[in-house]
Regions:
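Helical mechanochemical/support elements of P-loop NTPase systems and associated helical scaffolds
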Residues: 39, 58-65, 146-149, 170, ...
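Solvent-exposed loop/turn segments at secondary-structure junctions
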Residues: 28-32, 89-92, 116-120, 166-170
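Extended, hydrophilic extramembrane loops/domains of integral membrane proteins
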Residues: 150-183
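Membrane-embedded segments
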Residues: 1-81, 98
Length: 201
């Protein structure tokens, strides 16, 4: 699923022009993989280097990732800002809906894409082929797609929730929405500017 998301983001980057993009990766914690930039070649390079090994803490801290993404924007810019959350798991670490509300108060729209399975799937152990994470009681940990939370996050951020299919991740639809949002903003202001878009895992 990670490779599928990376390919979709790479294709989206190819369609950008005069837009800023950044990358944040998250599991049990969130890290800036690529600061906001218009250097699309660097974006694709940093994207290609993303793997499950670069985040040491397991989990799904969506709220931390949203907070970090929101802080990464240039504060005083008048351009439209969007965060796209792509995840395949449940959120256990923090209050992601509250984080989305706080980000939206700063003028940031939050979109979410769910890539997991509602019935869930075991989480592979790093460096241990064929073995899966276990909880304190020795039970295999099952990571399930929590669509309700992702819908709530998108609602709090006045964005869209998209369930990824086997053939389409949903980034094209979100890119159209972000471009529409920017066009509406430009019509209101009557001058041209560029959008600050933020992409992260």
């Amino acid at each position: 699923r990670l490779e599928k998301a990376k390919m979709a983001i790479s294709r989206m980057v190819e369609k950008l022009s005069n837009d800023k993009i950044g990358l944040i990766v998250f599991a049990g914690d969130a890290y800036v993989q690529l600061p906001i930039t218009t250097d699309y070649s660097s974006a694709k390079l940093f994207l290609s280097n993303i793997s499950t090994d670069i985040v040491p803490v397991q989990g799904t801290a969506i709220g931390s990732a949203i907070d970090l993404a929101a802080r990464s924007f240039t504060p005083e810019t008048e351009t439209s800002k969007a965060i796209i959350v792509i995840t395949d798991g449940e959120n256990h670490q923090d209050d992601a809906v509250a984080a989305a509300k706080q980000a939206h108060e700063k003028g940031i729209v939050i979109h979410t894409i769910g890539m997991g399975l509602e019935q869930g799937a075991p989480i592979p152990e790093k460096g241990k082929p064929g073995q899966f994470m276990q909880d304190g009681q020795g039970n295999v940990v099952i990571s399930k797609l929590d669509e309700q939370t992702l819908q709530d996050i998108a609602k709090a951020g006045e964005g869209l929730y998209i369930r990824a299919s086997n053939t389409e991740v949903g980034l094209n639809r979100l890119l159209d929405e972000v471009n529409r949002m920017e066009k509406s903003l430009l019509e209101e202001r009557g001058y041209s500017d560029y959008a600050e878009k933020y992409q992260y895992f």
